[in-house]
Amino acid sequence: MGHSKQIRILLLNEMEKLEKTLFRLEQGFELQFRLGPTLQGKAVTVYTNYPFPGETFNREKFRSLEWENPTEREDDSDKYCKLNLQQAGSFQYYFLQGNEKSGGGYIVVDPILYVGADNHVLPLDCVTLQTFLAKCLGPFDEWESRLRVAKESGYNMIHFTPLQTLGLSRSCYSLANQLELNPDFSRPNKKYTWSDVGQLVEKMKKEWNVLCITDVVYNHTAANSKWIQEHPESAYNLVNSPHLKPAWVLDRALWHLSCDVAEGKYKEKGVPALIENDHQMNCIRKIIWEDIFPKIQLWEFFQVDVYKAVEQFRRLLTQENRKITTKPDPKEHLKIIQDPEYRRLGCTVDMNIALATFIPHDKGPAAIDECCNWFRKRIEELNSEKHQLVNYHQEQAVNCLLGNVFYERMAGHGPKLGPVTRKHPLVTRYFTFPFEEMTVSTEESMIHNPNKACFLMAHNGWVMGDDPLRNFAEPGSEVYLRRELICWGDSVKLRYGNKPEDCPYLWAHMKKYTEITATYFQGVRLDNCHSTPLHVAEYMLDAARKLQPNLYVVAELFTGSEDLDNIFVTRLGISSLIREAMSAYNSHEEGRLVYRYGGEPVGSFVQPCLRPLMPAIAHALFMDITHDNECPIVHRSEYDALPSTTIVSMACCASGSTKGYDELVPHQISVVSEERFYTKWNPGASPSNTGEVNFQSGIIAARCAINKLHQELGAQGFIQVYVDQVDEDIVAVTRHSPSIHQSVVSVSRTAFRNPKTSFYSKEVPQMCIPGKIEEVVLEARTIERNTKPYQKDKNSINGMPNITVEIREHIQLSESKIVKQAGVATKGPNEYIQEIEFENLSPGSVIIFRVSLDPHAQVAVGILRNHLTQFSPHFKSGSLAVENSDPILKIPFAFIASKLTLAELNQVLYRCEAEEQEDGGGCYDIPNWSSLKYAGLQGLMSVLAEIRPKNDLGHPFCDNLRSGDWMIDYVSNRLISRSGTIAEVGKWFQAMFFYLKQIPRYLIPCYFDAILIGAYTTLLDIAWKQMSSFVQNGSTFVKHLSLGSVQMCGVGKCPSLPLLSPSLMDVPYRLNEITKEKEQCCVSLAAGLPHFSSGIFRCWGRDTFIALRGLLLITGRYLEARNIILAFAGTLRHGLIPNLLGEGTYARYNCRDAVWWWLQCIQDYCKMVPNGLDILKCPVSRMYPTDDSVPLSAGTLDQPLFEVIQEVMQRHIQGIQFRERNAGPQIDRNMKDEGFNITAGVDEETGFVYGGNRLNCGTWMDKMGESDRARNRGIPATPRDGSAVEIVGLSKSTVRWLLELSKKRIFPYHEVRVKRHGKVVTISYDEWNKKIQDNFEKLFHVSEDPXDFNEKHPNLVHKRGIYKDSYGASSPWCDYQLRPNFTIAMVVAPELFTAEKAWKALEIAEKKLLGPLGMKTLDPDDMVYCGIYDNALDNDNYNLAKGFNYHQGPEWLWPVGYFLRAKLYFSKLMGPEANAKTVFLVKNILSRHYVHLERSPWKGLPELTNENGQYCPFSCETQAWSIATVLETLYDL
């Protein structure tokens, strides 16, 4: 049963675009695409660029996937196409519906990291990474001694900042040459190359078990890069990006202003070189507005030269033969067209629009002058608008500039740069200027000289709050003009364009750079990822993955939105996103981040191997500090390093840090200005030695222990996480293994405030740890030692020598110095709790416990897991085989349960409240929530199926399980109280629950679910094995529908059916528990749950026989079907079968159609069951041999079934007329007196069965008015007297069948005899059959021809091309109502219909009546139509009160089956195209039933819905005939 291959299912839904949804999968997983309900029955093709096995990945190359249908059945519920994922990266899929693209998304497959000489796997959650600034590693021959510090500290991954040649600024991220190793690493006598780096990386991987990754920087290059001067097209310069010219002019003006301020030229105007107050800032603002902006007149770049434009306009007006070249759009107004070259006053307007707008009234000079003046005025207005727009940009530019000045010169947290100089100008320059300085005006002339302008390049930077998917240097963005860029003056922004052809050199250069990186490193960190154009990063990573298929891709994203993050993660296949612990403002937030970034809750449910693919959050690389973060010692305190790093390391994801954190370097190590080298490893170094470190330095010793623990927890499957905020400074994090049920609990006392200057309470709250503490894995305290305080060293990046950690590893609790004492308490019979009292948990301390379940519980879990392996291999780990368990557990559950009959399975799996109450029980009630729908396992499974995928452990259901054994005992006791195999199954549960009760309460929901789901799926398999091959080989949908047969068919304490003839073979018997007598126990069929499930209201003739073919014959339950047919046959009276059966003795013979449904079932039985015709000879024990006899006991008078059938036909031809027994309020409190008079007969002319009167309702549409207030009491809403269309169809089907049987001499009668006017008249079946055939379409079809002479009431026709609902009703207009009943006649007697007419009528029904799940019971165009059924409403509305509209609009489910079956039948006659379309339609409609069935806690289909498929609270939640007719439709498919 249990397969261990991990399969994920992605449901495709129409128009669902999931580009922003992250789907993460692992290599070795299978991904199945399946059709969601909106796409079932449609032609869908799935395409993906995931390559064929053995092919290399090509992002542009898509292939279609083949559909697989495991059951080869027509419905689409199981159809899938799949990918076996064996390759890491990001892969796209999309799907077409027909030829239209309908939806799509991405899947990300994680890389597998291999490390060590044996190439073992390093799981992503085990990664412990440390960042090194490459330039601080010193000469290459000294790297090993410096990197050894990371190895000794327990890191297994090193991240190097770029190793390439640096630019002038010496920033680690400003590279002068992307292809060359930084020459700083070489010695004068020894030049090192990439292969030397590669050898070291390989050595670290093989010998140290350490992987290496490095940065790739795609956005910019150093301003002094030689290659950018040779290829200026690779940057945004004033030739390829002329839109930057105004920004450049402003930039130069501000540079000159800055130089003047530095030289003191603005001292008089209030701006000295040293800016230190708001007044000086205001003076800068004034100078810019009064001196700079008026000089540079930026608005001119966006304006039109008025004089030139007017002259051109005048010339055009005076041309004699001018033609408007293109007729302008009348909606177009005159507007300024931007000069693409951005010359001053170089913009233009469309003269065609101008000429069409300003038209002179004659050709005279005065008129032309007037026109030109109007034109001039308009141009001046447009220019003025541009002036205002530029003013608005200038305002923002001044604000941004002053904000920058404030940060750099005055802010407390800023760099405080001091006086303005050329080295530290007033503001950073936005553009390079590799020329001699000149005056502003001379400089400006260069921008129109392409040979010089191409070297005026834009710097890169970042824009606060900008959309990361927009490139801020492209046209349309005003970031440079508005000075919104936080600029990196050492780097030039690179301009890739949209494809390699747009800038061939740049793409090739960067590809080569990427390939060098991927050749030597296992992974890359995408620097500044959010500003990297996605298409560029995709192209580069594709190149990298060709060389390094399991490339580990790390990135930092500052998009501010998870949706945007996901776009980058999914498109680029990012493996881990860097998350910063420094973003936490207190310990509480730090704990929240641990919970957010990984793991599942402790005690989580076991998820099946085959399950839906759920959206994920990106895998995290959780860093206690990144190289960009400010120093935590400054922000928090040196005492916080140890507790915060412990909290971060306890997260169930990758973790990381930056070199310097462990050594307690008390300042940020600057990526730009730091030139000292890192310390080396020396086990014997003294604290005063600034150039060397060992385990006594900083927190290195503790870091080593914590890193080892992090890797162990990841590798050993401690995937469950619980975070407890003990108090404002103490955070406890639990990592739990769901297979061995061991926990590791860390308790960290953070020190966000310096303990020397802030108050921390001596009192530390007690802690309760559930389970038995095996050991203290680590206890560590941050302490001061007696050495010289920190002094910054000249050569080495040194830390604080006076702070270290005192650590003790793997000790017993009694040896701990942090824990005072530990008491043991028990919380319940199986709850083992250790109470921890702390003595020395000072700020900056941590203690980590390893905790097991108490031994007793550990054994119980092991035994449970051992017995659960029969259901799933998942439970092998942690399982324990013992000899002395209950003997019943030694037998496989499937073996015990295989003896259950389907009738017994009804009791084990189902039974609603009313059925259970009959047996003296009831459904389980969960306090503060609700009762379960079923007493059997399905009641529990319906709730678990809701909460398991969401892992909703806080649900009241789980609370109830954790609080006590009531539900557990309910499950087993309910079954044990019954007899036979059911009790055996109960004993198996009891034996399993014996162990379940011995495990900690927090684990009970997960194991209770595991026991139940194992048993439940086994029981379903046992049910299906007892059904027909159609079900056994059927789709999931077919199988789940077939369970409706188990759900509806059962045996209660009291038999619902009258007793069968004692001479009948194979009748099931049982021993009555009270009388100890043998009694019949035939299965009866409930009409619906919960309303029609027990007592006399369980069995109804009509419901039973509409449902019988689907629920019993198609599922192969032939014996049960036979018994029900014969039991009802025994109750025949007046030639009718009762509707309300009432065990036969309380039967009501008030319906005209049940007998015809019964006959149809006999026909179906004979055709579908092997040797089915034998039923005709079976004995029927007549309860009422004559209309007036008292009920006779079984066996008093037996008759073969064929005689009973003949009696029905005889009585109808003779005519049936009687008054119901006990007529009056005692049998029907609403019926008027005349309604109790029952009539039925056959029309001599037409052969149609007719009956009923205006005050009764003898068909399935049997609503009787009940409201005195609305005055509809005793009035049927739908009398349908006369000849109802479905009864005519059913009688035709029976007559035709009896005719066939009599010809074959199987049925001994070929005619019926009646007395008419004292004479005996015979009517042959042949004649009767012919009469109906000849008259049906003539009288029932409403012709398209208004002059059709067959139409008695042409004035009542309001829809043509349909079939009437009845013929000869007492209210003639009722005949003409459009209802779904004619489709029943189409299915049982298709020979009555002409294919074309039938097809037209079906099309109308589809358009007017078909709802999402059911068929409207009345044409919505009818004036009494109302689609919402409310049985509780009592008002003055005659048509609605007390649910009078039950069949006047609400959408009933069972007719949908007949509609679809009719459609399928006639589509075949209409040709292959119509048939194909119909098959699609049927699948699509049924997919909604599938969804409803899956989601319904009742696991059934309802009786009806309100209009448009809305839920109706008055409907049965699951109805026999609804399930049956849908199953019949699938059978026909």
UniProtKB/Swiss-Prot annotation:
Its EC number is 2.4.1.25, 3.2.1.33. The modification Phosphoserine is found at residue 64. It is found in: Cytoplasm. Ubiquitinated. The keyword Zinc does not apply. GO terms for cellular component: cytoplasm. Keywords: Cytoplasm, Glycogen biosynthesis, Glycogen storage disease, Glycosidase, Glycosyltransferase, Hydrolase, Multifunctional enzyme, Phosphoprotein, Transferase, Ubl conjugation. The keyword Hydrolase applies. It comes from the Eukaryota. The active site is at 527, 530, 628. It catalyses: Transfers a segment of a (1->4)-alpha-D-glucan to a new position in an acceptor, which may be glucose or a (1->4)-alpha-D-glucan; Hydrolysis of (1->6)-alpha-D-glucosidic branch linkages in glycogen phosphorylase limit dextrin. GO terms for biological process: glycogen biosynthetic process; glycogen catabolic process. NCBIfam families: glyc_debranch. Monomer. Interacts with NHLRC1/malin. Belongs to the glycogen debranching enzyme family. Multifunctional enzyme acting as 1,4-alpha-D-glucan:1,4-alpha-D-glucan 4-alpha-D-glycosyltransferase and amylo-1,6-glucosidase in glycogen degradation. This is Glycogen debranching enzyme. It comes from Canis lupus familiaris (Dog). The lineage of its organism: Eukaryota, Metazoa, Chordata, Craniata, Vertebrata.
